Amino acid sequence: MHGAETGFTVFEEWDLTTSPHHQIGSKPQHVSAADICSADAAPRAPLRMFFGRNIASSSRQLIDKHDLKKRPYISTTSMDAELALVTANLALAGPGRIFFDPFVGTGGFLVSAAEFGALTFGSDIDGRSFRGSGRGIELGVGANFRNYALEHGLGDCIISDLTNTPLRLSVSLNHESGRWLDGIICDPPYGIREGLKVLGTRNSKVEAGKAGLHMIDGVPAHMREGYIAPKRPYSFSLMLDNILEFAARTLVDDARLAFWMPTADEEDGEMSIPANPYLQLIHCCVQPFNKWSRRLLVYRRRKEGEVGSSPKVNGQVRHLKGDAETADELNPFRKRYFQGFRPPEAIP
């Protein structure tokens, strides 16, 4: 039948046979009647049968289609294609939905979300990550979208820092008005090769007290071509809280936030799962490595009636020293990584 609206399937479960002569649908000429009647002959009826309606088809062919080796623009930090597709799928990427990646990099998550039909946008503190070395977004992330004929799924990418985002945030966390994203998917930087940084200066109070703008040849420094904004070290734990806070202020009701978080296998809560009262953790998938692992955390944006009248905004207390400045002090996982994840008593 062609063009059927509904498909039905029958599954049969058969018992394993020890007969080396059993062939489905045929009877070899050298098999005797005694063999057929023997105890080890193939059963004549299945153990169980299942009858059901076909509601969806597998998309495993997308894994080979999106193989990183076939992409024109990648980097050493590009997320594995299968994991990116799983992330976008768990975040419910689909037609008519707007998805955002605040750490876009080479756009692997955006491509996966666009494959499922979503309209995607991204940002990164370093514009070179999504546009290449001065080549432009068309030859960077855009080349990957063009490679899969998904140009319609790419909105744009901007240079931005999640803690200083120019995007609209809902003023009230208790009302849906002002929230506009249907999904957020990302793989935040772990800060291992170099410490995490955000826009700003180490001593922001001193900088804020300076009068006027810094001028060069009569032009504000930040308006000149090639301007590079100053950056300061930042805590990995606080960044996780920032991601949840950003999601709570931008995701519509029941929308999803999905991101990856590294953790040491024997950690005792130092890097526990971040929480926010406006977000419900619904999935926690673990990818183990040798001495560490990373988790795919998926949250659902709670509806107005599911949140208490006066919830605590920060759902988790961060135990950080107030004078933390170095990359290791701001990122406990980075410190453990370079210590080889040895127990504290084994560290000199």
Question: Across the structure, where does each feature detected by a protein language model lie?
Answer:
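Class I S-adenosyl-L-methionine-dependent methyltransferase catalytic core
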Residues: 3-348
